[in-house]
Amino acid sequence: MTGTESRAEIGALGEQLAVDYLQGLGLRVLARNWRCRYGELDVIAADGRAVVFIEVKTRTTDRFGGVAQAVTPTKVRRLRRLAGVWLAQQPGHWAAVRIDVVTVRIGRRRVPEVTHIKGVA
């Protein structure tokens, strides 16, 4: 990072790093930045027969809190609603549904720090 990146550029970088991490775990990305009138889902992936809705949070500092503060109860409710809308539009059915959070900490470190919390909702 050069220090001149916009919030959008930092967010896009964090999301790409998260997708790379998830694919490295064997998840298959179905959609990125899926939008409807209620909001946006960052990443939708398949983990075997489970569909996973992933909220990606990118941080350059701890000023806004760490992983524990990344997703509030209000955000979880919104993610559940969005997941329901996406699922209602799908022709098939999934054996399981999961909501995960991936935080990416980038900044002065050479290697970004990725934290993956499975099943937050």
UniProtKB/Swiss-Prot annotation:
A Pfam family this chain is assigned to: UPF0102
GO molecular function terms attached to this record: nucleic acid binding
InterPro entries: Restrct_endonuc-II-like, tRNA_endonuc-like_dom_sf, UPF0102_YraN-like
Superkingdom in the source lineage: Bacteria
CDD domains membership: PoNe_Nuclease (cd20736)
Family under the similarity heading: Belongs to the UPF0102 family.
PANTHER family: UPF0102 PROTEIN YRAN
Protein name per Swiss-Prot or TrEMBL: UPF0102 protein Mvan_2202
Organism: Mycolicibacterium vanbaalenii (strain DSM 7251 / JCM 13017 / BCRC 16820 / KCTC 9966 / NRRL B-24157 / PYR-1)
